[in-house]
Regions:
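UBC/E2-like fold recognition across ubiquitin and ubiquitin-like conjugation systems
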Residues: 1-59, 68-169
Length: 169
C-alpha cells in the first residue's frame, strides 16, 4: 500500500541520518518491505557487548518484513546472526517482545525505537552469543522463527505478558 511505502521511505531516511550509527539497513533483493538490519550497539556495560568484542562480532543481524497493513500491524522481526541465547531470543531467532504482536503494537513506533527496545531487552534478558560447539554455527530459520513466534503469542494471550522482577535482570 502507499501508506506502507511512504512510511518505510521516511523510516529509511531517518535511519540514514542517525548520528550514532546505532543501526544500519540493507534492503533484501531491493525490496522496500524486507530489511536486514544491523544492530551495531548494545549497552557497553553488558556481558553481550563483552561477548561481541571477544568474538569479533561487529553487529547483530536481524530481518524485518513489513506486512501489507504496516504501520498498523507490526513487522515480523527475527535474529539472523550471531546465534544468541537468552535475551528473549527463542528458537529460529524469534523475538519475545509484546510490542511485536498485534495487541502490543502501535503505528507510532518507529523501526529505530523498536530496535532500541530490542537492544535493551537483549541486555535485560541477559542475552549471550552462543559458543557451544556445533550449535553456534547452525543458522536460525525463518520457518522455525515464525512457528515459535506464533506459539509464544498464543501463550502470552492466554497468560498475559509479565515483566520479570528486577532481580531477573
Amino acid at each position: 500500500t502507499q501508506v506502507r511505502s511512504r512510511r518505510l521511505m521516511k523510516e529509511l531516511q531517518d535511519i540514514a541520518r542517525l548520528s550514532d550509527r546505532f543501526i544500519s539497513v540493507e534492503l533484501v533483493d531491493e525490496s522496500l518491505f524486507d530489511w536486514n538490519v544491523k544492530l551495531h550497539q548494545v549497552d557497553k556495560d553488558s556481558v553481550l557487548w563483552q561477548d561481541m568484542k571477544e568474538t569479533n562480532t561487529e553487529f547483530i543481524l536481524l530481518n524485518l518484513t513489513f506486512p501489507d497493513n504496516f504501520p498498523f500491524s507490526p513487522p515480523f522481526m527475527r535474529v539472523l546472526s550471531p546465534r544468541l541465547e537468552n535475551g528473549y531470543v527463542l528458537d529460529g531467532g524469534a523475538i519475545c517482545m509484546e510490542l511485536l504482536t498485534p495487541r502490543g503494537w502501535s503505528s507510532a513506533y518507529t523501526v529505530e525505537a523498536v530496535m532500541r527496545q530490542f537492544a535493551a531487552s537483549l541486555v535485560k534478558g541477559q542475552g549471550r552469543i552462543c559458543r557451544k560447539a556445533g550449535k553456534s554455527k547452525k543458522s536460525f530459520s525463518r520457518k522455525e522463527a515464525e512457528a515459535t513466534f506464533k506459539s509464544l503469542v498464543k501463550t502470552h494471550e492466554k497468560y498475559g505478558w509479565v515483566t520479570p522482577p528486577v532481580s531477573d535482570g
